[in-house]
């Protein structure tokens, strides 16, 4: 598994993501602040999020510039 740091500005949420859990963003942001970014986002080769929308939103809320990602083929 190859983990790369990717700029948040280059990552795109999946438009039809069925989960709408914005209430979890604050807690995930607190966890990232305390423990660091432990689980990378999974994105496709076009940098669209496959898994990790809440982590993406939490990272944005923390002002992070890039996040660890696994690029799925």
State where each predicted segment sits:
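Short, charged/polar connector segments at secondary-structure boundaries
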Residues: 1-73
